[in-house]
């Protein structure tokens, strides 16, 4: 037997918040702010957005490791936050997130049509998220009422290590019966999500405008003037540079053109690992 490069894509692995649902990725961000506030520690929306894409416990740990947040915690409690403190914040975060997730469950405009176009091409739809399963179960149920059902879902606590490690993306490959990781594309609005796809050996597509990086509602995004939008795209592209996404697009509605381009590159013998 000989190895043969795949010549067409078999699967997309889609993130959830900021990619398919919750334009601007508001659900997790606001809850981080509220969870810290219950411990009398102020965290801004901008600070809360920083580690987005990681599993939520890791996200809180990363926030607590930031010097300015650690100092606020020290002033409130007389010590810097330990792992036990992180767990306490996480345990408050979880019920708040479950309680309020429905407020930010709308599908991103055009997502359903885009996914339908991919399925017509025989492309399977895997998915993963920085949410734990307890939250994902509710997110998945809400999305189903709006017409979106992924072929597979992997929550961050269903693998040994979440993003930026590749386990969630690779769990989708196994569950979907994909022949080769190079026949997959990971689509995400965060740096950890793009690193996940890169480390899994997949093609990667970073979303610049629908998710955490821009942090606007769909209406606010549509209202941006051309100069501001161009400036924001440039800022966000620089943010993603170190994770080396193969493509950067505004929203999931731009994905079909990318899929066509990747298929053409695969047909020429190109592989994601060599780019």
Curated annotation (Swiss-Prot):
GO terms for molecular function: magnesium ion binding; phosphoglycolate phosphatase activity; phosphonoacetaldehyde hydrolase activity. GO terms for cellular component: cytosol. Its EC number is 3.11.1.1. Its cofactor is Mg(2+). It is an enzyme of class 3 (hydrolase). Disulfide bonds: none annotated. One of its GO terms (biological process) is organic phosphonate catabolic process. It catalyses: phosphonoacetaldehyde + H2O = acetaldehyde + phosphate + H(+). Pfam families: Hydrolase. The active site is at 15 (nucleophile), 56 (schiff-base intermediate with substrate). Signal peptide: none annotated. Transmembrane segments: none annotated. Involved in phosphonate degradation. Belongs to the HAD-like hydrolase superfamily. PhnX family. This is Phosphonoacetaldehyde hydrolase. It comes from Pseudomonas fluorescens (strain SBW25).
